[in-house]
């Protein structure tokens, strides 16, 4: 099945501590999760690696969010939207279900 949310899509978070925040999808993971830029930040404790000249400390990173907790953002309606698929000129394209506009 084709992915409804892809890399570089602008999404809005539907549930969790970052609800109603918007961001760009940086990575889509095969286990049904996405990583969104600037959303779901966690603090990782990293050890120093002297061989690489890397200092240790606390590092903020984006954690994965389940794809069911994000929805694609429709810029014309300024709301979260659902995605549909249709064929145009023998190509499968994604479209917003609210206004039939191609993504």
Swiss-Prot record:
Signal peptide extent: none
Keywords (A to Z) from UniProt: Ribonucleoprotein, Ribosomal protein, RNA-binding, rRNA-binding
GO terms under biological process: translation
Entries under Pfam families matching the protein: KOW, ribosomal_L24
Source species, domain of life: Bacteria
PROSITE patterns found in the cross-reference section: RIBOSOMAL_L24
GO annotations of cellular component type: ribonucleoprotein complex; ribosome
GO molecular function: rRNA binding; structural constituent of ribosome
Record family assignment: Belongs to the universal ribosomal protein uL24 family.
Function: One of two assembly initiator proteins, it binds directly to the 5'-end of the 23S rRNA, where it nucleates assembly of the 50S subunit. One of the proteins that surrounds the polypeptide exit tunnel on the outside of the subunit.
Complex and partners: Part of the 50S ribosomal subunit.
Name by which UniProt lists this protein: Large ribosomal subunit protein uL24
Gene coding for it: rplX
